[in-house]
A protein has these predicted regions:
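A short aromatic-anchored loop/beta-hairpin motif
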Residues: 18-217
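C-terminal segment of classical bacterial N-terminal signal peptides
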Residues: 13-17
């Protein structure tokens, strides 16, 4: 499991006084001659509900060998959750009250390096959950509602609940620039990938598939 350097929930991304460029670096200039990069933005299209697969040459320790589910993609920027970094912190340790009602929840997941004290939830529900963010069909991201009520009112299969601390974020144009540079591949998301029972090998499996796709073109 991915270690979060001890006291996970005490980590912060930047001092409160940090300006926007510290948290969201300015995007690199876009090279419009990079046809492969632009094709990457379109097939599948960069949008909410796709997966970002870290390229082999992405060495940023926050994102190296990560799989990220894009939960928001708007003119204000992009937000996502890292899917394949379970921590060594149990839900019982981080959220003892929730654990009383949901004792089967095991480990907290590292969602990304921004706002690591914030908690959010991914879950599968066959019924619409009003007021939540539907990422793809039957998959919901919850970070504003009361987690207790959502979990207690709706009977959720324990295989399809993940709790995350922190998230990943990009300023407008920043992720597009990183895609064109080759830092990421885009892949279609589905329930089996989002709630993969072996997150430790998820990147290895997906990087083989995405690179094979490019080689075959």
């Amino acid at each position: 499991m991915w270690k979060l350097f001890g006291a996970f929930l005490l980590l912060s991304v930047a001092p409160a006084s940090a300006d926007a460029d510290t948290i969201f670096p300015r995007p690199l200039p876009v090279n419009k001659d990079n046809a492969r990069g632009y094709e990457q933005l379109l097939n599948p299209a960069l949008n909410k509900g796709v997966l970002l697969v870290a390229g082999k040459n992405l060495y940023d320790p926050n994102f190296e060998k990560t799989i990220i589910l894009v939960t928001e993609y708007t003119e204000d920027g992009t937000v996502g959750l890292v899917l394949n970094r379970p921590t060594e912190i149990t839900v019982a340790e981080a959220l003892p009250k929730l654990s009383e009602y949901m004792p089967y929840l095991d480990y907290l997941y590292f969602g990304g390096p921004i706002a690591t004290t914030s908690i959010s939830l991914l879950l599968k529900s066959e019924t619409r959950l009003p007021g939540t963010n539907q990422v793809i069909t039957n998959i919901y991201h919850i970070n504003t509602l009361d987690l207790f009520n959502v979990l207690l009112i709706n009977k959720i299969d324990k295989r399809y609940i993940r709790i995350y601390a922190g998230f990943a974020g990009w300023a407008p144009g920043q992720l597009e620039s990183e895609l064109i540079r080759g830092d990421w591949y885009i892949w279609h998301a589905d329930i089996n990938l989002i709630f993969n029972s072996e997150p430790g090998i998820l990147w290895d499996e997906l990087i083989r598939m995405v690179t094979a796709k490019w080689v075959s073109r």
